[in-house]
């Protein structure tokens, strides 16, 4: 064996040993992000006894810029940029995200190594005044940072006033309790994961409020070239959840959507069949125009399904709504 071949072989062995001995997980510092990273850490540790798994907690621009609407400062990519930099710089091996916070298209350097089994995808009403949105008094102020939620709220409940709210789950609850809002809308799964079930006044059904693409799913991101890391996290992947969120994200990608536009999408496996049904929505910010479309197909055609539903929405005039939103 030549010296060059020997050096390469030793390098590859060292890489395998390094991966086998430890893995570092990049995560945001918010309580919910830490919960998700700890969840992934526990799963990896369970599957790989003896492997050292540690968190690399980071602050992101999205966590720091709390005085402006996300739609006006660059969208939810602000929550992942620092974590991706940690992967590229070698400070972390994987990054854990809420899938709904990730852009539809990743940089060529990265891939989704796993989508964990999805949790509750629905939104929740949190208020100290009523158990339902319809029972809130006219003019009641409802807080949300999501244009998707704003659009659907105003369409179904025009008697309400919707205002921007930023911060992590506990910060938003504090603002509600402090009287700045009469109610707020949050993802049910976030409250459940933080053992805040008691704060949920009512869970909003899929028919009441269609979720964001990927809502409720935890994503594990890694570098495309890290084959050993991809093999390590592959057992965390849930096949059906992966197909469903692929269909949802495909709709959003077809519409060039991100958190700066009111797009909703939710796919689920049809009971007793080998098909997933996909529902999607595009709405104006003031809720005066809501477009809906749906279709179904086998899981392996998830991306094609999403493209078809996206085309249906475009045929209904979604491009006009989205161009109007972009000008605001």
Language-model region placement:
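Short, structured active-site "lid" loops
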Residues: 69-91
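Short, Lys/Arg-enriched N-terminal segments with co-localized hydrophobic residues
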Residues: 7-18
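Short, Asp-centered acidic motifs that coordinate Mg2+ and/or phosphate
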Residues: 93-94, 183
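Small-molecule-sensing regulatory modules
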Residues: 20-65, 72, 80, 99, ...
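Extracytoplasmic loops/domains of multi-pass membrane proteins
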Residues: 85-86, 97, 102-107
């Amino acid at each position: 064996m030549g010296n060059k071949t020997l050096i390469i072989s030793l390098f590859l062995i060292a890489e395998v040993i390094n991966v086998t001995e430890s893995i570092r997980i990049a995560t945001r510092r918010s309580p919910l992000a830490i919960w998700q990273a700890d969840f992934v850490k526990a799963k990896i540790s369970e599957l790989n006894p003896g492997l050292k798994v540690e968190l690399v907690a980071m602050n992101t621009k999205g966590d720091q810029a709390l005085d402006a609407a996300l739609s006006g400062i660059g969208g939810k990519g602000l929550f992942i940029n620092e974590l991706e930099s940690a992967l590229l710089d070698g400070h972390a091996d994987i990054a854990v995200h809420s899938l709904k916070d990730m852009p539809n298209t990743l940089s060529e350097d990265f891939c989704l190594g796993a989508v964990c089994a999805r949790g509750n995808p629905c939104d929740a009403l949190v208020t100290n005044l009523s158990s339902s949105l319809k029972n809130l008094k006219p003019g009641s102020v409802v807080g949300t940072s999501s244009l998707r939620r704003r659009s659907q709220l105003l369409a179904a409940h025009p008697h309400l006033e919707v205002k921007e709210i930023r911060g992590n789950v506990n910060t938003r609850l504090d603002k509600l309790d402090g009287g700045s809002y009469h109610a707020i809308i949050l993802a049910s799964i976030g409250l459940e994961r933080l053992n805040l079930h008691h704060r949920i006044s009512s869970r909003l059904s899929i028919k009441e409020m269609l979720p964001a693409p990927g809502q409720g799913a935890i994503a594990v991101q890694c570098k495309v070239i890290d084959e050993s890391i991809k093999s390590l996290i592959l057992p965390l992947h849930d096949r059906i959840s992966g197909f469903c969120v692929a269909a949802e994200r495909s709709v959003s990608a077809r519409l060039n959507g991100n958190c700066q536009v009111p797009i909703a999408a939710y796919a689920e496996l049809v009971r007793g069949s080998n098909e997933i049904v996909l529902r999607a929505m595009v709405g104006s910010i003031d809720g005066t125009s809501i477009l809906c479309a749906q279709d179904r197909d086998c899981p392996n055609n998830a991306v094609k399904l999403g493209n078809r539903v996206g085309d249906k929405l475009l045929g209904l005039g979604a491009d006009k709504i989205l161009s109007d939103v972009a000008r605001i």
